[in-house]
Amino acid sequence: MSDGFTLWFTGLSGAGKTTIAEIVGPELERRGRLVEYLDGDAVRQHLSKGLGFSKEDRDTNIERAGWVASRLTRQGGAVIVSAISPYAETRAKARDMIEEFGPFVEVHIDASVETCAERDVKGLYEKAFRGEIKGFTGVDDPYEEPDSPEVVVETEGKTPEESADVVIARLEELGLIPAQVTA
């Protein structure tokens, strides 16, 4: 088995997944890890073009991200996936694919729908609340919170840097990255 692993950031739109991932990644690189990012929007654009937002299409999108992450993990990469991935069963499938080659670290980025709506610069929540967008996760489509993620980051009242520190500390505890030596 390689020394690769996957961090799977899951949470509502606007919870802070990508923001925190973009802080964690450079820290992993600083500690000698080769990092690859699979952002949900980029995966949808490049690997899942043409898919909609039905449950089946969302599952297909996440399974594709999981397959790519498993291959990168097999090659020793530190893979950071940031995707809403709303359904527990599909996250479990991704976990199974990835754990064949290395650890899967589920990182639940937790924020209320209200907080996410306040952070929403695209106005998607407002449109979903008005019924202009159907099937919006957390509004009229479910988000199944993880039962036992390896990391839970409650972002309300924390800066993105403080949230990233929670993830880094847990990776140190799990032995996936060397502990930071402070003088």
What does each model-found stretch correspond to?
Residues 22-70, 74:
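Conserved substrate/cofactor phosphate-moiety recognition/catalytic segment
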Residues 17:
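Conserved lysine of the Walker
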Residues 13:
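The conserved Walker
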Residues 46-52, 69-129, 135:
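ATP-dependent NMP and nucleoside kinases share a basic, alpha-helical "lid"
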Residues 9:
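Hydrophobic anchor at the beta1->P-loop junction of P-loop NTPases
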Residues 37, 104-106, 150-152:
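Conserved beta-strand scaffold positions in the cores of enzyme catalytic domains, especially
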Residues 1-6:
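Extreme N-terminal, non-catalytic leader segments
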Residues 110-166, 174-183:
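Small-molecule kinase domains that catalyze NTP-dependent phosphoryl transfer to phosphate-bearing small molecules
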